[in-house]
């Protein structure tokens, strides 16, 4: 598609009340700017991002996902404002679509409407029940007549619900004509892109209004806005995967990050959270389980289990209240109340209730290796570094500090002693 896209991402976003640049705040595990670029690249091979505030931090974050984006650093000293942001761009194509980096819900399909409008100047417009807080868009004879800031609006203009959504399509020649003529004679001393509307109308050009969906063009300016946008985004993610065949019970209670991938027939129960770039294949994730940056293949997890980052679980049963961290489990049963951290457990092994791998010595983490067909009895502690070889047994209640060889039974608890008649003697002596 012969279209250049410019994404404005230079602002600090002071209303977010954060040291993090606004466009790097995340929803569903990805930065806001990531979503805008992803949709832009569906339409164009010429995408530029205008930066200023913490520009190197923004570039470093986005380069993880996209390698072919052009970055333009705005001259914020001499040319501040949205109009100034466009003064340093070098578009490849005749049509230029201007987007905002704080609109993570924008979708490529709706952006195609700007091209279908058939005008050299198209401006996005929202039709709201209450336009309070926005500049009003006055439309006359099928063209945008002017944009009036709320403080300057008449009573009649304030009653309008038509407001500027902040996305524009320009012809390159039109932009080249008007950008040099922008002035900053306003209270903020900034160059406003919206002033191009008035210039174009004075030259009797049509500024075509394009009415768009509020949900898709919602700007994120505060933490409250971010929460609303994330709720919408996670709903889209859930619906996308359900269309692909993933079954979800009470989907509105399930949280899934953008980077998560499902393969085959999966069943996700209510209250589940799956984050990072987790990979779930042919598996059943039961209620209220949490999976972070892990791989689950042909397994069942939960209910109320927790897979922390860097777990790989294959053909394994992970039961309730089992926590696994940075571990590889293949063909394993760990049914209840266990902590398995920094360990490798091979097929056929059974981890009893209350088993803990003691992986941290106060300075660094150590590995626990458990071989094939190992039975680890309940309430055992495996003090790493330690290796339990194939076909061995750990007696319940043991604390294992030494390696266990294949075929051995390991016990480390005091011998039980039963004292006859003790109950009667004990309680009679207290009377």
From Swiss-Prot:
Function: Catalyzes the last two sequential reactions in the de novo biosynthetic pathway for UDP-N-acetylglucosamine (UDP-GlcNAc). The C-terminal domain catalyzes the transfer of acetyl group from acetyl coenzyme A to glucosamine-1-phosphate (GlcN-1-P) to produce N-acetylglucosamine-1-phosphate (GlcNAc-1-P), which is converted into UDP-GlcNAc by the transfer of uridine 5-monophosphate (from uridine 5-triphosphate), a reaction catalyzed by the N-terminal domain.
EC nos: 2.7.7.23, 2.3.1.157
Cofactor annotation: Mg(2+)
Keywords: Acyltransferase, Cell shape, Cell wall biogenesis/degradation, Cytoplasm, Magnesium, Metal-binding, Multifunctional enzyme, Nucleotidyltransferase, Peptidoglycan synthesis, Repeat, Transferase
Residues covered by region (Pyrophosphorylase): 1-223
Xref: HAMAP family: GlmU (MF_01631)
Record protein name field: Bifunctional protein GlmU
Active-site residues annotated for this sequence: 336
Disulphides: none
Chain positions covered by the region annotation N-acetyltransferase: 245-431
GO cellular component: cytoplasm; membrane
Catalyzed chemical reaction(s): alpha-D-glucosamine 1-phosphate + acetyl-CoA = N-acetyl-alpha-D-glucosamine 1-phosphate + CoA + H(+); N-acetyl-alpha-D-glucosamine 1-phosphate + UTP + H(+) = UDP-N-acetyl-alpha-D-glucosamine + diphosphate
Residues that coordinate or bind Mg(2+): 102, 221
One of the GO biological process terms: UDP-N-acetylglucosamine biosynthetic process
Pfam family, one: NTP_transf_3
Keyword Magnesium: yes
Organism the protein comes from: Wolinella succinogenes (strain ATCC 29543 / DSM 1740 / CCUG 13145 / JCM 31913 / LMG 7466 / NCTC 11488 / FDC 602W) (Vibrio succinogenes)
Binding residues for UDP-N-acetyl-alpha-D-glucosamine: 8-11, 22, 74, 81-82, 135, 149, 164, 221, 308, 325, 339, 350
Main location, first listed in the record: cytoplasm
